[in-house]
Amino acid sequence: MQPATLYLDNAASTRPADEVLEAMADAATRWFGNPSSAHSHGAGATRALEEARAAVMKALGTDVGQLIFTSGGTEANALGVLGAAALARGRHLITSAIEHAAVLRNAEKLATERAFELSTVLPEPATGVVAAEAIASRLRRDTAVVALMLVNNELGTVQPVAEVARALDAFAAREGIRRPHLHVDAVQAFGLLPVRAGTLGADSIALSAHKLHGPKGVGALWLRPGARVAALWDGGRQERGLRSGTENVPAIVGFGQAARLASAALRAGTPDRIAALRDALEAGILAAVPGARPTVTGGARAAHIASLAFPRLPAEPLLHALEARGVFVSAGSACASKTSGPSHVLKAVGVDDHTAVLRFSLSRQSTAEDVDAAVAALAGAVGELSE
C-alpha cells in the first residue's frame, strides 16, 4: 500500500489553486484570439491581459512603472540583468554568492562576452544574509548593475534590499552620477511575504507565478518609472517592445488570479500561520533527530522555508527514504538536487560535503498534521539510515 503523499517542496513549485485553473480554462476558451489582432477577439484577449497586469501590479503595491510579462522567473531575471547591462556605460556588476543561477550565470555571461568585471559578495556564514555594507564597499563609478535577491530560495533568508537601495542612492549623490541599476529577484518572495515596489527601492523586480499557486511558464519583470532595459530579442515587439512573442493569455490570466489570491492570504495573516508551522516543524525535527541543526540562524527569514542540516548523513539516500514514506522535500533546492555535493549557496555558508541539508518548504495549504507527519517520517528515515 502506497503511503499518503505529503508535498513539502513548495519553494520548488506549488500546486495551482483551483480558482487559478478555472480562470485559465475560461480564458483559453473565451479569449483565444491574439491580443495584437484588431478585431473583437483580439480586444477581448487584450482586456484579459491588462486586467491580469493590473492585478499583479496591485499585489506589488504599485500602479506606476511597467510590468512586462515573460515566460517565467528565469527570463525575468535575464531581462533585468542583461537588459540593464546592455544600456549601461559602466562595465562593473555586483551580485551575491547566493543568487539563483538565473542571475549568476547571466552575470558570468556578461563577464565572458562583454568584458564586465564581477564583484561577488559572500553572505555572513552564520546568518546567510549579505550585508548591505559589503555591497556598498564594492561600489565604483563604473558600477552598472547591482543584483540581489529578496529571499534566498535554499535558505529562506531575507536580504537587505531596501538598505542596499539607500546605499546606492547615497553613493550616487556623493559621486554626482546616475545610480547603478538595482535588480531584485523576488521570485521566492512575491505572494509569500509583503513585497512593495515603492519601499524596496529597486529598478527592476523579477516575479514568477508558479511559486504562489499559479501556473508554470509565466513570470514578469516590473520596471520602476524611468528605469530602462534592452529587449533580449526582437520580433513583434509585444509587451511595451521589451518581450516579443504572442502573449500566453491563459497563463497570464492565471498569474493575475494567483496574485489576487496571494494578496488576500497576506491580508488574512497567512504568513504568521505558516511561520508558526515552520517553527513547529523545526522544533520537532531538532528534538527527534540527534545532531540536526538549522543551516543558518539569526537572520530575517521568509515564513515558508525551513533549511536543516544533518551532519554525517547522505542527502540523496535521506531524500529517497523520505519519499518512500510519502514525504517530498528537496536537498538544498530542486535546482541543485541533481548535482553531487552541496550547492553554491550551501558552500557559501560553510556546508561541507559530509552534511546533508534538507529544505522543507510550506504553503498556505500546509497544516499542523502535515508537520507532525513530516517529523515522524524524518525520524524514521534517519533511524533507517543510521542502522
Residues covered by each model-derived region:
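Pyridoxal 5′-phosphate
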Residues: 1-387
